[in-house]
Amino acid sequence: MLQLLKNGRWNVMTLLITISILIVLAVLLVTIWTTVKAYNVKHTIDPPQENHSDSHNQ
């Protein structure tokens, strides 16, 4: 890190921008991955239960 500071501000700025872009890309990839995974889940609805007793129909 000291070597970067000795070389000037442009190298530090380049390093920070590079790290920031990598973080943004990582978050984007995780977001896309979880969205695709969520769309692949098969959603089902349980059929209604038929009760033949009269006590539940009141």
Curated annotation (Swiss-Prot):
Main localisation, per the record?
A: membrane
Listed GO CC annotations:
plasma membrane
NCBIfam families registered for this protein in UniProt: small_YtzI
Q: Which domain of life is it from?
A: Bacteria
| Gene of this entry | ytzI
The name under which this protein is listed is: Uncharacterized membrane protein YtzI
Q: Which organism is it from?
A: Bacillus subtilis (strain 168)
Q: How does it sit in the membrane?
A: Single-pass membrane protein
Q: Does the keyword Cell membrane apply?
A: yes
Q: Write out the annotated subcellular location.
A: Cell membrane
Q: Where are the transmembrane segments?
A: 12-32
What UniProt keywords are attached to this protein's entry? Cell membrane, Membrane, Transmembrane, Transmembrane helix
